[in-house]
């Protein structure tokens, strides 16, 4: 584990769980036993199976590897990134509630009380929506649900600075 700017412990390498489908649990266990200490997933059934990551976390106890030894990262995926038939939150709910519902689904799927990192899977337009999303994520962080926040698939340095300053 390595320190970062918020004094959280990050894994040196994360194992990505996208596109593993029914093999997710076995592959996560194999990766962690091989030395990975970070797991990256998302509440996005289109590409991830978070419930099988949760199964893997449970199975790892049989090898003496506890949750607290791992860096667990999940993501909120906005509607545009979801399969319309498998959205893990209420599509018609306000954005803030979608994020809260997605995060609660992640905790249930992962059988975890908290995650080390909650990531916004991609920027959201318009900017006002993006800032609302970030505010909802900050609430999760402030209540201890996520130890740190981030954004992926963002190529706008100005936006990253704005989120950091928020």
Go through each PLM region and give its residues:
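N-terminal binding-site loop/beta-alpha segment at the start of enzyme catalytic domains
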Residues: 1-74, 113, 132, 142
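Alpha-helix initiation/capping motif
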Residues: 66, 77, 93-94
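Glycine/proline-rich, positively charged
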Residues: 83-166
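Active-site beta-loop-alpha junctions enriched in small/polar residues
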Residues: 18-20, 44, 75-79, 120-123, ...
């Amino acid at each position: 584990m390595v320190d970062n700017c918020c004094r959280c412990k990050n894994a040196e390498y994360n194992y990505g769980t996208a596109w593993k489908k029914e093999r997710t649990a076995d592959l996560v266990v194999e990766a962690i036993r091989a030395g990975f200490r970070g797991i990256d997933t998302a509440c996005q059934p289109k590409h991830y199976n978070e419930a099988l990551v949760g199964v893997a976390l449970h199975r790892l106890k049989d090898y003496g590897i506890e949750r607290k030894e791992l860096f667990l990262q999940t993501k909120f995926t906005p509607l545009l990134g979801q399969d319309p038939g498998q959205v893990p939150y209420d599509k018609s709910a306000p954005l803030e509630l979608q994020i809260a519902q997605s995060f609660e689904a992640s905790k249930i799927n992962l059988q975890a009380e908290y995650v080390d990192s909650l990531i916004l899977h991609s920027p959201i337009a318009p900017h006002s929506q993006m800032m609302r999303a970030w505010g909802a994520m900050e609430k999760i962080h402030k209540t201890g649900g996520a130890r740190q926040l981030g954004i992926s698939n963002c190529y706008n340095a100005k936006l990253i600075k704005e989120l950091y300053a928020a």
